[in-house]
């Protein structure tokens, strides 16, 4: 009898070890996938900006430069000095350092969520979190893989969860650690930390926590929140987004209602990031489950914590309503706290299920998550190839670069498509980063776009018309320019270009405005000029260097920086 019992116990232990090896192998495989994605994901948009001292064209060369940059950044653009300091620190190093640290941080964040949900590390639950967290976050390309974006979102979440775990721990040393994490965590991201703060305060009230360390840590966390929200740069950024402090309560309420409408409409739109839709479903499921438990008076302290996180998720939505911004990653705070509430409410229940049900859940999760993994790798690979192509063209001296047709396969979920067609950041700082002259990128469908717009164009004088596309003004010229060189002074005169460009484009030449290179081409016998209105000011010298191709004539443009 005893021998049979020992054999049964040995078999159980053997099965346990086998499953642990499987889970461990899948964890290593997934982390290797994340590392590979990080390696091929290129620098884009803000990565170029933050490689320089803010407001200057001087490359970062040390910690002192980062402090100078962040002091100016805090006053002029954003109060998130912690995450942006870390981003600039990483950008001053080789990207290989970030590639490794980002994977380690993601694994650490998943571990903290596991601890918050089940109090211990269980490999199969840790694997579930690793697979699903990045997958259902809005725009993981911008919130997880993109260097600057990752610090603003997933790293911010990591610091906030580290603070939360330490704060709620029963061990005094961790409570003391929470005091040191409080201000940095509170400063990370305003649309995330406000919801977390409300959640933790509400949880403290409902569970009647009176620990002095707990209260002090919350006050320090709120101080970090205020250091972000009340930063001079935060108000400047809000004004840029169209939020005016003196616009009146009525106008602000209307704007909030419009934002609510946009969010609800966006959730049901086919173009909505499906990660946001999944998080909305998780929010609803968790809310129904917890409300039923509360009504039946069967709630536990864990259920109360999950309910507080749900309330915090709604607070995060309220934080963004006045801005009018409702696109994918703006909803990161809502999505993350909804996901966290779901994990806290349900993951511990998996430990009570039979082994075969856990196997079914894990197998289904692995299969389902492999699909976005494949899509992410394919999309990021295409995007990386595109950025290398643009860099190589810029280094060859090309001023106007027609994008690769394959770029149209890139979707916004796994890549930040706001950087697809260069604006001020790309045209200026990318050129500085690549150590090339200014350049502009046109859509691979520029000629098809012109044809599509030709029937619904903005009418100008006879035989002239203007359309706008991808930040470019496209203007149909009356005739082919005759001079071999035309000088355009961004601070006043337009010399020979007067007869070819309409007055509203010529008026763009004013001090403080930003413009870019003009690209001239022909299509079906007509001549067109394209103008990107967001690139740096300066003197534009247009050299005609015709390369005759079917229905196309390109004119290369060079720019000379103006010292004014």
Map each language-model feature to its residues.
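Alpha-helical transmembrane segments
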Residues: 20-33, 126-131, 180, 217-222
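Residue-level signature of transmembrane alpha-helical entry/exit and packing/kink sites
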Residues: 23, 99, 174-178, 213, ...
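Transmembrane catalytic cores of multi-pass membrane glycosyltransferases
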Residues: 35-96, 100, 147, 182-310, ...
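C-terminal structural cap/anchor segments
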Residues: 326-379, 385
């Amino acid at each position: 009898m005893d021998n049979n019992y020992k054999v049964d116990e040995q078999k159980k232990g053997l099965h346990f070890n086998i499953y642990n090896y499987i889970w461990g192998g899948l964890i290593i495989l997934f982390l290797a996938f994340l590392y590979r994605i990080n390696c091929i994901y290129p620098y884009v948009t803000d990565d170029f900006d933050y490689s320089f001292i803010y407001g200057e064209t001087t490359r970062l060369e040390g910690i002192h430069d980062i402090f100078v940059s962040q002091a100016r950044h805090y006053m002029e653009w954003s109060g998130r000095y912690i995450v942006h300091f870390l981003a600039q620190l990483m950008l001053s190093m080789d990207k290989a350092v970030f590639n490794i640290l980002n994977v380690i941080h993601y694994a650490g964040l998943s571990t903290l969520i596991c601890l918050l949900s089940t109090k211990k590390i269980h490999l199969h639950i840790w694997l579930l979190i690793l697979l699903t967290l990045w997958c259902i976050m809005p725009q993981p390309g911008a919130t997880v893989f993109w260097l600057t974006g990752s610090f603003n979102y997933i790293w911010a979440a990591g610091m906030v969860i580290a603070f939360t775990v330490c704060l709620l721990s029963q061990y005094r040393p961790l409570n003391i650690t929470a005091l040191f994490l409080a201000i940095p965590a509170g400063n990370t991201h305003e649309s995330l930390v406000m919801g977390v703060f409300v959640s933790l305060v509400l949880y403290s009230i409902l569970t009647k926590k009176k620990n002095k360390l707990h209260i002090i840590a919350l006050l320090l966390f709120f101080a970090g929140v205020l250091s972000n929200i009340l930063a001079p740069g935060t108000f400047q950024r809000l004004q840029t987004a169209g939020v005016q402090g003196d616009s009146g309560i009525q106008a602000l309420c209307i704007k909030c209602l419009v934002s609510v409408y946009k969010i609800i409409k966006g959730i049901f739109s086919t173009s909505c990031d499906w990660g946001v839709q999944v998080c909305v479903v998780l929010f609803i499921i968790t809310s129904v489950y917890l409300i039923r438990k509360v009504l039946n008076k069967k709630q536990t302290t864990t259920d109360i914590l999950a309910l507080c996180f749900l309330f915090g998720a709604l607070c995060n939505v309220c934080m963004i309503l006045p801005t009018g911004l409702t696109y994918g990653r703006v909803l990161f705070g809502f999505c993350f706290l909804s996901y966290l509430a779901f994990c806290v409410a349900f993951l511990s229940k998996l430990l009570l299920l039979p082994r075969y049900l856990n196997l079914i859940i894990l197998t289904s999760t692995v299969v389902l998550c492999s699909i976005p993994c494949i899509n992410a790798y394919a999309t990021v690979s295409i995007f990386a190839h595109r950025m290398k192509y643009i860099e190589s063209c810029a280094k060859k001296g090309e001023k106007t670069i027609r994008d690769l047709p394959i770029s149209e396969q890139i979707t916004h979920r796994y890549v930040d498509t706001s950087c697809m067609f260069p604006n001020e950041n790309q045209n200026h700082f990318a050129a500085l980063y690549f150590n090339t002259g200014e350049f502009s990128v046109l859509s691979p469908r520029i000629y098809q776009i012109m044809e599509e717009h030709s029937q619904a164009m903005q009418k100008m004088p006879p035989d002239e018309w203007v359309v706008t596309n991808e930040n470019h003004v496209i203007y149909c010229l009356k005739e082919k320019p005759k001079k071999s060189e035309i000088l355009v002074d961004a601070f006043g005169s337009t010399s020979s270009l007067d007869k070819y460009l309409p007055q509203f484009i010529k008026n763009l030449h004013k001090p403080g405005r930003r413009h870019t290179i003009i690209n001239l081409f022909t299509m079906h016998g007509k001549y067109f000029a394209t103008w990107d209105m967001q690139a740096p000011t300066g003197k534009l010298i247009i050299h005609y260097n015709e390369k005759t191709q079917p229905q196309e004539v390109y004119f290369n443009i060079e720019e000379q920086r103006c010292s004014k």
